[in-house]
Amino acid sequence: MSTRLKQITESKWMDLLGVVTVVGASIALGFHKTVIAGLPIGILSTVGAAVSMMGTRWATKRKNWGNAVGVVTSVNSAIVDYFLGNKAAFLTYPVSLIGNALSFFVWSRKGDRIPRTLDRYYFAVAGGAFALAFGLNYIGFTGFLQHGIAEEDLSKFWVTALITGITFSGTLNMPRMYADTWVFWLVYNSLKLYQNILFGNVAFVAKYVFYLVNAVMAWRVWHFVRKTEPLKP
């Protein structure tokens, strides 16, 4: 069963299904037509979503191209998120960029790329990631500490900081290839799925259902690989 699941998870038709899902979601919502401050934010977001999906799929298959794509899409996502109201985007996305670049560097030096089990380093990084996420978002939402968080931005701050913390935890732990890093992406996609159900964004619900399923499958497969192809001492 695990071998069959690995074949399905790493198949090209899953790549195609993922790209079609995220692009279809954006087009179905008409999001690709969005223009803010003269910038084609909708187009940037739609293209970025498709490229990001391929990056996720490559990372799922333990291919280093996924990390390289993550570096590029971090820049695109920072621009899109900033113009959509994330006031801390240019503070937080460089962390994701550095995390993806570090993963690319570390993975390029690993021949086997076998996932590992949890250790103390994993939890230390996760704790630091959440502290950094809340700190950077606080700086961003207070205009670099020039004022308090506006009342209308308070809920946005908490949601953004929490999601950023989960993202940092997943990204900064990816270089060491912990199988359970996918748990962070599972939680992240569950939150995004719930958020879009509340807002009634049916198309985005389909998008995050796919990401959620991919995270579960990747988690199972990485643990399967870890157990069948143990790390060399």
Predicted regions and their residues:
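Polytopic alpha-helical membrane-helix bundles and their juxtamembrane interface segments
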Residues: 2-61, 98-100, 106-233
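Short glycine/serine/threonine-biased micro-segments
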Residues: 68, 83, 198
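Hydrophobic, ordered structural segments
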Residues: 72-111
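Alpha-helical transmembrane segments and their helix-entry boundary regions
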Residues: 66-67, 88-90, 181, 203-204
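Long, highly hydrophobic alpha-helical transmembrane signal-anchor segments
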Residues: 50-78
